[in-house]
Amino acid sequence: MYMLFENEDRSFIANLPIFFHDPAHQFLAIVLTLLGLLLGFSAAQNSLARIQLKQLALKLKNYSAWSLGENILNQAVEDEEIFKIKRVDRAILFFDIRGFTKWSEKESPENVVNMLNDYYIQAEVLTKDIPKLKVKYTADEIMVVFTNVDYAAKAAIIMRDHLNQYLEKYQLKIGGGIHLGPVVEGLIGSDKHKLFDVMGDTVNTAKRLCESAKGSEVLVSIEFIELTEGKAFTTECREVILKGKEKPFQVFPLTNYFAS
């Protein structure tokens, strides 16, 4: 463009050797070449930065989903109120592996971790289509939080049947417990370290029911039976002593469940 504006004589413009004989023209050519290289490099850097930013965003999303759970993460994007401490009604399901401690003492740490990871993966795959609020893994214990008791019961039946089949090769079994009622829910922790969790007597009772289950039983509370209105199939009611409870607690071994 500079050549066109400075020289209207086309024959002169066409004579490039003469044009570039001028030191000023040589300087301009060098500057324009360097400018083009700089712009090209800048565009490449911007493109690389965008790719790296997308990769970082994906990693952060995965890390957040691992910590919070994908369901909570998706809700938080729309409404951060989900993180606030609040009292809500939830159905809590616990499972743990019977004889896990004794079994793990005979195994290498690597074998124990590999077995647990496979166990967790199995549980996740089995319940992937069942809506749940939160899943928490603690050693051989699985806690799942549901907003709907039907989901909790359905997940319990599926997990009990299939995870016990998976654990047969280790000569292990799982037992579980379900209780429902009010919990305190939200982000719990210090300024720098927080965790989305649920707390309260409902959670403790579900855990105690799980601990009291025999073999591969899933024990449910009288509150569960009353709320589900005939959907649950159980064997005979019995009373157990739960840690922290003054009176015997009525429990029902859940055999099947039919949600409407």
Predicted regions and their residues:
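Alpha-helix/helix-capping structural signal
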Residues: 98, 182-183, 204, 223
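Cytosolic regulatory/linker segments at or just downstream of nucleotide-handling modules
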Residues: 215-260
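Catalytic NTP-binding/metal-coordinating core of nucleotidyl cyclase/transferase enzymes
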Residues: 79-154
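Juxtamembrane segments at transmembrane-helix boundaries
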Residues: 1-9
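Residues that scaffold the ATP/ADP-binding catalytic core of kinase and kinase-like folds
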Residues: 103, 145, 186-188, 227-228
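Regulatory cytosolic signal-relay segments
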Residues: 12-88
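Alpha-helical scaffold within the catalytic cores of cyclic-nucleotide enzymes
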Residues: 114-132, 143-176, 180-181, 201-214, ...
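Short, surface-exposed loop/helix-turn segments at secondary-structure junctions
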Residues: 188-200
